[in-house]
Design a protein with these regions (language model features):
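Conserved donor NDP-sugar-binding/catalytic core segment of glycosyltransferases
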Residues: 101-133
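A conserved acidic beta->alpha catalytic loop
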Residues: 29, 43-52, 96
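N-proximal low-complexity "stem/linker" segments adjacent to membrane-targeting elements
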Residues: 1, 5-29
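A recurrent flexible, glycine/aromatic-enriched loop bordering the glycosyltransferase active site
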Residues: 153-170
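Conserved donor nucleotide-binding strand/loop of the catalytic core
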Residues: 54-72, 76, 80
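Short, acidic, metal-binding catalytic loop of nucleotide-sugar glycosyltransferases
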Residues: 28-37
């Protein structure tokens, strides 16, 4: 069950647009074994009832704005979390469903001096996500942006990465 006390100020930032059912599942999945200080939902101008549903929810911080895209939503949410004094910010889209122990698995690495971002392993319908790589090279349009594909479903020790998608980085 979810604990009620949080030692670190951990703020989850979720960006959503017109995917209310996915958002509901995402919020349920954020009820982690280790507590999150707060959940910030950046609603990018949803028109499917999400705005009204969010207004009726308790325990969420909701930022309603016009649709400025995913990156714009993350900018808004990360800025809010930073100004709120977050020690760690957990970013994700509304279609990301972290396992109940995901945060618990990430927390032991937060005290290490050489770690600035933690990225959990991404699975799609229980299978390894096909584009999970250790590095993304966006500087040359003539070569693949992917390098060093991660192999194996379970990674038993931390693996250095130089980039990640906005699908669960902490």
């Amino acid at each position: 069950k979810r604990q009620t006390k949080c030692i670190m100020n951990i703020i989850a930032v979720v960006v959503t647009y017109n995917r209310m059912e996915l958002l509901k599942r995402n919020i349920r999945c954020l009820q982690q074994n280790k507590p999150i200080s707060s959940i910030v939902i950046v609603n990018n101008g949803s028109t499917d009832g999400t705005t009204e549903w969010l207004a009726a929810q308790e325990g969420l911080t909701v930022i309603n704005q016009t649709n400025v895209g995913g990156a714009g939503g993350f900018y808004t949410g990360i800025q809010y979390a930073y100004q709120a004094g977050a020690d760690w910010i957990w970013c994700m889209d509304d279609d990301v469903f972290p396992r109940a122990d995901c945060l618990e698995q990430l927390l032991p690495y937060t005290g290490k001096k050489d770690i600035g971002i933690l990225a959990p392993r991404r699975l799609l319908e229980g299978e390894i996500f096909t584009h999970d790589f250790q590095a993304y090279n966006l500087s040359n349009p003539f070569v693949s942006m992917y390098s060093k594909k991660l192999a194996g479903r379970h990674i038993t020790s931390p693996t250095e990465i130089t980039g990640t998608a906005f699908e669960g980085p902490f």
